[in-house]
A protein has these predicted regions:
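His/Met- and acidic-residue-enriched segments that coordinate or traffic transition-metal cofactors
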Residues: 2-13, 17-183
Length: 183
């Protein structure tokens, strides 16, 4: 009788602990597991875009002939430098290796704009900023809505309002640049 009660207690104990051990194993693999590829790709793409924004912002602050374009460039340099620093920490925490230099696609955009000057630079730079920020808003919104990693999703959500503000500012600056060209 004693042996049966002990065996029964052991079986009940195992039955109670088994679901908890599966839950613990699942949660530890979520924390320590590999970041989903889509989230890692988002981080890498955001880092490249952010570095490009900083580089182009420096060029605009230096080369722009229009004061609004100059100011926009300075703002891009400041805001994207801050976001890049946050993203570097997030990437490090998630085990994502970021390149310290621009890839060919982003470097090509920088090189093309760096060759321009005056009103041509102003126009092409601000056009590029409108296009880039439209694209950024879509990508960040997608990550904020559908990202698999909670920390990456949170960072995208936190950064999104600033990108939307940049887009509005780029669009209003673009209108001003086009209007000044007509006069």
């Amino acid at each position: 009788m004693f042996k049966f009660a002990t065996t029964k207690a052991l079986i009940v104990g195992i039955a109670l602990l088994l679901p908890a051990s599966f839950a613990l194993a699942a949660s530890s693999s979520d924390r320590g597991g590999k970041l989903p590829k889509a989230d890692a790709d988002f981080i890498k793409d955001a880092a490249q875009g952010g570095m490009m924004e900083v580089e182009l912002g420096k060029i605009a602050a230096d080369k722009a002939s229009n004061s609004q374009v100059k100011d926009f460039g300075k703002r891009m340099q400041q805001d994207h430098s801050k976001a890049n620093d946050e993203l570097k920490k997030l990437a490090s925490d998630k085990g994502v290796q970021l390149s310290a230099t621009l890839d060919k696609k982003h470097q090509s955009k920088v090189d093309k704009l760096a060759k321009l000057s005056g009103t041509e630079f102003d126009r092409k730079y601000i056009d590029a900023m409108v296009d880039d920020h439209k694209d950024d808003v879509k990508k960040f919104q997608k990550e904020a809505d559908k990202g698999k990693d909670a920390d990456v999703q949170k960072w995208a959500s936190k950064t999104l309002p600033t990108l939307k503000e940049h887009l509005q500012l780029a669009q209003s600056t673009e209108k001003q640049v086009k209007a000044s060209k007509k006069t």
